[in-house]
């Protein structure tokens, strides 16, 4: 491939590790300036997961030991501080020291680990733990986040109680439902479990019927 892309990725990794990683408490700061000054030391799971995604894909492409080390540290930080052992799932936001700031549960912290890195790491490493974690998260999604019409909803309390008055739940996010349909079919391809295929195709059919404009070829953003 074009080595300039690898060099840019390496420069980004250098910056992330030098300025973005919290050496005292672990985890990635939400935001730093271009010069590396921390401007938001909280640890939103959205940020943690996509930092981890970058490390995972860089590791797959380069087998870089430093990236692999920070990938392990990132995943360990999230598992130790953000995973809810009682109810399952990741909480939304941590304080700098890893204590829970917001224990609500949103779509992205649950599903982004699958679409971001777990379903790429498993084919690359064949580590069954990655596939088992992906299946566990998908099972939680289907159990707690899918309504009786088959749609995936957005925000929940710590114990997975649906929050009907939350602004994120005022509509259905079409893109997120498309993501789940793809993830279900990807899990079927990796596991051979026909239940994933059945559920993925059912959600796909529902999306095509209610959210796709055949005349324009475009998807609605929400329902």
Where do the protein language model's features map onto the residues?
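Glycan-recognition and catalytic cores of secretory/periplasmic carbohydrate-active enzymes
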Residues: 1-223
């Amino acid at each position: 491939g074009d080595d300039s892309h690898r060099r840019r990725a390496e420069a980004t990794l250098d910056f992330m590790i030098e300025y973005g990683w919290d050496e005292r408490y672990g985890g990635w700061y939400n935001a730093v300036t271009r010069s590396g000054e921390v401007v938001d030391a909280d640890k939103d799971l959205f940020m943690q997961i996509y930092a981890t995604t970058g490390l995972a894909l860089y590791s797959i492409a380069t087998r870089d030991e430093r990236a692999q080390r920070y990938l392990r540290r990132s995943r360990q930080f999230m598992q130790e501080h953000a995973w809810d052992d009682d109810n399952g799932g990741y909480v939304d936001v941590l304080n700098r020291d890893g204590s829970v700031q917001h224990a609500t549960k949103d779509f992205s912290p649950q599903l982004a680990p699958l679409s971001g890195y777990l379903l790429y790491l498993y084919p690359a490493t064949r580590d069954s733990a990655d596939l088992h974690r992906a299946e566990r998260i998908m099972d939680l999604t289907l159990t707690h986040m899918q309504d009786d019409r088959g749609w995936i909803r957005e925000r929940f309390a710590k114990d997975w109680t649906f929050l009907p008055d939350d602004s994120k739940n005022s509509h259905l996010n079409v893109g997120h439902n498309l993501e789940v349909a793809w993830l279900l079919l990807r899990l079927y391809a990796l596991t051979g479990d026909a239940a994933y295929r059945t559920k993925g195709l059912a959600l796909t059919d529902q999306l095509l019927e209610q959210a796709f404009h055949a005349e324009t070829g475009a998807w609605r953003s929400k329902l």
